[in-house]
Amino acid sequence: MGMTIEHYKIGERYNPRAREKKWQEIWDEKKIFQTVQGDGREKYYVLEMFPYPSGRIHMGHVRNYAMGDVVARYKRAKGFNVLHPMGWDAFGMPAENAALQSKVHPKTWTYENIAVMRGQLKQLGLSLDWAREFATCDVDYYHRQQMLFLDFYQKGLVARKVAKVNWDPVDHTVLANEQVVDGRGWRSGALVEQRELTQWFFKISDFSEDLLAGLEELDQWPEKVRTMQKNWIGKSQGLLIRWALKSTADDAGGSNDVCEAFDEVVCYSTRPDTLFGASFLALSVDHPIAQSLAKKDKALAAFIENCRCGGTTTAALETAEKQGFLTPLVAVHPFDETVHIPVYIANFVLMDYGTGAIFGCPAHDQRDFDFARKYDLPIKPVVLPRETKVEDFVLAEMPYTGDGVMINSSFLDGLTPQQAFEEVAKRLEQQVLHGQPQGKKTVQFRLRDWGISRQRYWGCPIPMIHCTSCGVVPVPRADLPVVLPDDVTFDQPGNPLARHEMWQDVACPICGQPAKRETDTMDTFVDSSWYYARFTAPFAPEPVEKQATAEWLPVQQYIGGIEHAILHLLYARFFMRAMKLVGHVSVDEPFKGLFTQGMVVHETYRDDQGWVSPAEISIVEKDGKRCAYKLTDQSEVTIGLIEKMSKSKKNVVDPDDIIASYGADTVRWFVLSDSPPERDVIWTESGVEGAHRFVQRVWRHVALSAAVLKDVAPRAGHQGAALELSKAAHRMLHAVEDDLEKFAFNRAIARLYEFLNIMAPLLNKVADVEDEMKAALRQAMDFFLAMIAPIMPHLAEECHAALGETTLMSELAWPVYDPALIVEESYTLPVQINGKKRGEVTVAATASETMIKEAVLALDFVQAQLVEKPMKKIIIVPQRIVNVVL
């Protein structure tokens, strides 16, 4: 296996390029990262979000996969049977865009990119089970996805319905609400339009309550992510209120043909306590009343059309200017029939939330307040803040949205808003309008069904057939997979499948008559909603193997960006529940632990021509200030903000270049060392050089001491300096273990720098120290290599071999610390005088309260204070603090 270093000369620099490749080949040859099913050890499944094969990996990938690899290698060393797979999230628009621009087939483009990126990932020395690799565009994978679709369809979890959708006019496809950001398509950046199309939906809303309740169990997820999902699911408890409608023509004694069909409207409200502050009703532009009125009113029809130019999402509606169209209808107040409230059609009311109609109380809601100010409507406060007098309460520039006491509200006056809610509900449930109760308590969810239809080629075909006689029918399971045709053209935007007659033409599986295939493909978020389950048995004939999922799921540790907090993570949680319902799995949640890592960021540079890349400049210190100059002509370049690495701003660093210059271990060490893993890491050349110097320093110390240490058996010291070294080593091992368990990689790295500093002077004179110290040094070095191995695996292997070992570091068990050696013999307590810290005292670990008191009273700064004032008492909190009260 070539695990010796005799050809190195003493003092020769470590050559990462040659060494790293060697160890990667040895790991591959021995298949040490291939996971064995049915192994008796405790299982641990660690997974990083798999990448989209865009062409090259970036530093964000490196950090993400380095984190996952540290966890995988550490858990393997701790005796777990680790599953750490890799695959490719390979369907999607960029491949079609490349086909349009470069005239290369999406399949060719995708698989070529996968080959490049696989090579890049392998250079990083990741302990991945490559035998389980798949791409979601593999026919084998999307065949199983089509099987899942049919299973869901048979269970009633798939619906086909006409829906208003977000249409991306650049990508010529439908976007889910979650894929619209600030009214624009998440990929194209185009302003989204609203269209009505017949779409396929997964009925995720059936699981709203369960998805919400499940969040309580996910205590190993960031609180922020759980909150985001909670808000997205959006459970609210409110009241359905039926309002009688009248035409303003009635009040004027005119004709009542305005809207004879509508004598009432139902509003949903989470704040029925504010009913006496209502000054308008607002209906969605899609409400049946709005549609009916628009048939007779051209101005209203034009208003509705104009509203449809914006996005359909809540976010889009919240940011758009509030607009309303006054109708010839008024609503009769449920508790006072003499009060008539104007009815508007408004652009900020969603038809698919609640009932598509709301009542506005401007005094206590920002949106209603803005609307009332714009249309000069009354703003009547009905909730008074506590400890405030009515005459002092003025709503000048903003509504009051806090708690308080009801005012200006008839029989509700003096109640709290919560009590008023219940009172209004009770009265309206007993009050009758047109033979039915006028109010009803209800629970609503914001979560909508997941529209999965996409009008594009490079996605998983939806296995349905359209027959003029039989309607829409599923493709028989035996006829799967529905394979994408290769002979498609990309000479125009839109879906090539819709133009491919031969592929579409098929016999109806029920009546045998000519029929057409569904040309929509599935949203690519479907592909990533179950891949983690497929990894447990990637070649099973069924989508998942129940025994394998029972063994491996949920994923113990999932790692990825917080940008997926809602979309991907919510869809994956839905998929697990759906797969459980159809009998494929026995667990509810896909991911037990979730870690969201920060980004890799870099300075930006620009000159008159635009953005400049780091490779094109040199940085020099001038008068104590950093200045940037172009390498070509030495012209000055402006140093801009530190931002996320992006091609558009040219502030990217190619991992290949850095690995070629410094080696993978240096890159891995740096991206994990500079800041806590949940925070952004700032990429700097000096930081990388510092990491590389550490690599060389480790190697130098091992190379210089190897001749002596290779023949020494490791053993803890029993006395003197050897004992002190062993104590430091065992404490360090204990602390680093704790850091790795908590994902505190940067803390572990800081300790390892410190530990090398402790060992260095002893290693420098290793030939001259006593045998007990040699044995303690050898044990300390073995511990050190075990601790750096998850982060810098190649260097650890090389050093391990240099010390005469023929085993692989990657297969070694994690060392065990001696509890007796990690006990602290003393500890330091902060000492306060009258609650202010004045100094510290160090006491023996076994010191009693009396001994601590004596030590504190003997301190000079305490003595000085006692001269001026006598002591009243001394408060001692063992292991925490001492407070002397004068």
UniProtKB/Swiss-Prot annotation:
User: Record keywords: Transferase included?
Assistant: no
Q: Where in the cell is it found?
A: Cytoplasm
Q: Which residues form the signal peptide?
A: none
UniProt-listed SUPFAM superfamilies: Anticodon-binding domain of a subclass of class I aminoacyl-tRNA synthetases (SSF47323), Nucleotidylyl transferase (SSF52374), ValRS/IleRS/LeuRS editing domain (SSF50677)
Q: Would the keyword Aminoacyl-tRNA synthetase be found if you checked this record's keyword annotation?
A: yes
Reaction catalysed by this enzyme:
tRNA(Leu) + L-leucine + ATP = L-leucyl-tRNA(Leu) + AMP + diphosphate
Q: Which annotated residues bind ATP? A: K647
EC number of the protein: 6.1.1.4
The EC category is ligase
Instruction: Name the Gene Ontology biological process terms.
Output: leucyl-tRNA aminoacylation
Supply the alphabetized keyword list: Aminoacyl-tRNA synthetase, ATP-binding, Cytoplasm, Ligase, Nucleotide-binding, Protein biosynthesis
A Pfam family name for this chain? tRNA-synt_1g
Q: Which family does it belong to?
A: Belongs to the class-I aminoacyl-tRNA synthetase family.
Annotated HAMAP family: Leu_tRNA_synth_B
Recorded protein name is Leucine--tRNA ligase
The encoding gene: leuS
